């Protein structure tokens, strides 16, 4: 079934310029809808870790992009929270039974789009989770945090207030941004452009990471890009240019996570009861 979906999506992608809500075939519509449903339920993921390597399923990302070609804008929501969009909200039509079955908590006015997966014991404070994102068990998405399209958020992660996790749709990115299990992302930090923050890492407040951001390891003096090693404690910093005329922003790995760090950043089970 998945192979059939992939084949249909790949073929539709090659013809994407000619797709519209009027002209798309039933086969293409069904394939895209089936894929979005799979994302919404967590049966499909844009990226998954296999044998310690993140594998990106580009065809699923293409299905997300194609979905915007297949729908017109429509009025949705009610009362003061009305929207005019092509993608319905995830919780539209939910009653108490559906929320209890999901096992998560959604604080107004948090919004998740259909096609985003929210696992059990997740808490969504007033935040935004975009289509294709995957938010795993026990994670807190704090106030005004944004989880971008197709971003992958691991288990027991804390995304602090105002954090931005970049998406893949605009500007178009090859790979999603990934925050692995048990990470703490400090307030107003931004992680974008497919950067991977490996498990058990801590980003201090105001850390900005893109593919072009230098990640300087204080212990080794080495500079890397695009990936924060497991168990790192990262703070914002700067590095001087070769001629000493100026400095540029960087991220500095100041140490490895220890018991003291964990005590400061541990999740509060009372909030997830």
UniProtKB/Swiss-Prot annotation:
What reaction gets catalysed by this protein? (S)-2,3,4,5-tetrahydrodipicolinate + succinyl-CoA + H2O = (S)-2-succinylamino-6-oxoheptanedioate + CoA
One Gene Ontology molecular-function label: 2,3,4,5-tetrahydropyridine-2,6-dicarboxylate N-succinyltransferase activity
- The organism's superkingdom is given as Bacteria
Question: Record-annotated residues binding substrate?
Answer: 105, 142
One GO location term (cellular component) = cytoplasm
Q: What are the subcellular locations of this protein?
A: Cytoplasm
- Principal cellular location given in the protein's record: cytoplasm
Q: Name one GO biological process term.
A: diaminopimelate biosynthetic process
UniProt keywords (A-Z) are: Acyltransferase, Amino-acid biosynthesis, Cytoplasm, Diaminopimelate biosynthesis, Lysine biosynthesis, Repeat, Transferase
Q: In which pathway does it act?
A: Amino-acid biosynthesis; L-lysine biosynthesis via DAP pathway; LL-2,6-diaminopimelate from (S)-tetrahydrodipicolinate (succinylase route): step 1/3
This enzyme's EC code(s) = 2.3.1.117
Instruction: Quote the PANTHER family the UniProt record gives.
Output: 2,3,4,5-TETRAHYDROPYRIDINE-2,6-DICARBOXYLATE N-SUCCINYLTRANSFERASE, MOLYBDENUM COFACTOR GUANYLYLTRANSFERASE
Q: What family does the database annotate?
A: Belongs to the transferase hexapeptide repeat family.
Self-association and partners: Homotrimer.
What is the protein name given in its UniProt record?
2,3,4,5-tetrahydropyridine-2,6-dicarboxylate N-succinyltransferase
Naturally occurring in which organism (per UniProt): Bordetella parapertussis (strain 12822 / ATCC BAA-587 / NCTC 13253)
Q: Which gene encodes it?
A: dapD
């Amino acid at each position: 079934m998945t192979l059939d979906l992939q084949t249909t999506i790949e073929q539709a992608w090659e013809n994407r310029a000619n797709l519209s809500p009027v002209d798309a075939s039933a086969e293409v519509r069904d394939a895209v809808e089936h894929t979005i449903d799979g994302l919404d339920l967590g049966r499909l993921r844009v990226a998954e870790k296999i044998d310690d390597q993140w594998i990106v399923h580009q065809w699923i990302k293409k299905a997300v992009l194609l979905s915007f070609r297949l729908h017109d804008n429509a009025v949705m929501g009610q009362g003061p929270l009305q929207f005019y969009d092509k993608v319905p909200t995830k919780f539209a039509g939910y009653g108490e039974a559906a929320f209890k079955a999901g096992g998560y908590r959604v604080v107004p006015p948090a919004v998740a789009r259909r096609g985003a997966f929210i696992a059990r014991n997740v808490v969504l404070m007033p935040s935004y989770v975009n289509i294709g994102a995957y938010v795993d068990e026990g994670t807190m998405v704090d106030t005004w945090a944004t989880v971008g399209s197709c971003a992958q958020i691991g288990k027991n992660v804390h995304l602090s207030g105002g954090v931005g996790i970049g998406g893949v749709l605009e500007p178009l990115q090859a790979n999603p941004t990934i925050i692995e299990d048990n990470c703490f992302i400090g307030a107003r930090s931004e992680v974008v452009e497919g950067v991977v923050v490996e498990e058990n890492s801590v980003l201090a407040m105001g850390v900005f990471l893109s593919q072009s951001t230098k990640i300087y390891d204080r212990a080794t003096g080495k500079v890397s890009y695009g990936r924060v090693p497991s168990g790192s404690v990262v703070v914002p910093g700067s590095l001087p240019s070769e001629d000493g005329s100026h400095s540029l922003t960087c991220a500095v790995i100041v140490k490895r996570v220890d018991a003291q760090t964990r005590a400061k950043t541990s999740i509060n089970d009372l909030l997830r009861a």
